[in-house]
């Protein structure tokens, strides 16, 4: 077999192996996407309810009487400090990306939109503190001189509520210590398998303005809801506020992971389809070259036979 034919055959075999790998990766991503969508659907009910509770408490002016400057005697983070508003000197930005590649344009879109958000609202990188969830985002912002105040790598492909707790504790602690004066969560929101959109949600300080009143019915408009609280407003909020923060961060992670798996599945399908096209082209090239080689051999044999006669 001529060297050119051997090279084409080698490329065909190599591309077939690549196609098998990308097809397997597509199947895995599709399975993960299906699984995480079930988690996201069931979780959305809880997330909507906890947001509604905080919104109602805010509208009832229950949050106005809370002492947000008090310190816990046990040394734990003051969760009521999540309500404290102060002049903004530094903005904290949570950026959710993946730890690895092979996810199409997922990471690049989130990073690009986050950079635009920063550049449009801040004059210097010193005004921003990055909280990176995912190694891709952490590495990107470190290389460009940003202050990566906290990074969280190795989060599960199907994250659990427990995964968000240490992250939320760190976020609230840094806000309480005035590492930043406001906090936004930036991530890719899953729309459908082929579409996602960038979102930047304000998480801290907690206020009704951040959440809107979408969860309130029209019958609530114009009324001030009165609550009787036991044992106290502070005791209730010390339980509810961390749950709200955890729900917001976990919801964003869950949404971002859904978008990541969808992007990965689409990217691997595209890679598999491209590999099939390349294989078809190479096989056609191989068959033509082989046919040409056979024709040449027959011509040479016929010519040699004629010369002998």
Curated annotation (Swiss-Prot):
Q: What does this protein do?
A: Produces ATP from ADP in the presence of a proton gradient across the membrane. The gamma chain is believed to be important in regulating ATPase activity and the flow of protons through the CF(0) complex.
Q: Which SUPFAM superfamilies does the entry mention?
A: ATP synthase (F1-ATPase), gamma subunit
Keyword Transport applies: yes
The text of the family note is: Belongs to the ATPase gamma chain family.
Q: Classify the protein's membrane topology as the record does.
A: Peripheral membrane protein
Keyword annotations for this protein, in alphabetical order, are: ATP synthesis, Cell membrane, CF(1), Hydrogen ion transport, Ion transport, Membrane, Transport
**Which HAMAP family would you find in this protein's record?**
ATP_synth_gamma_bact
Q: Tell me the organism.
A: Ligilactobacillus salivarius (strain UCC118) (Lactobacillus salivarius)
One example GO MF annotation? ATP binding
Output one GO BP term: proton motive force-driven plasma membrane ATP synthesis
Predominant location: membrane
| Protein name, entry field | ATP synthase gamma chain
Q: Which GO terms describe its cellular component?
A: plasma membrane; proton-transporting ATP synthase complex
Describe its partners and assembly state: F-type ATPases have 2 components, CF(1) - the catalytic core - and CF(0) - the membrane proton channel. CF(1) has five subunits: alpha(3), beta(3), gamma(1), delta(1), epsilon(1). CF(0) has three main subunits: a, b and c.
Q: Name one Pfam family in it.
A: ATP-synt
Q: Which NCBIfam families does the entry link to? A: ATPsyn_F1gamma, PRK05621.2-1
Q: Where in the cell is it found?
A: Cell membrane
Tagged with keyword Nuclease: no
Q: Which gene encodes it?
A: atpG
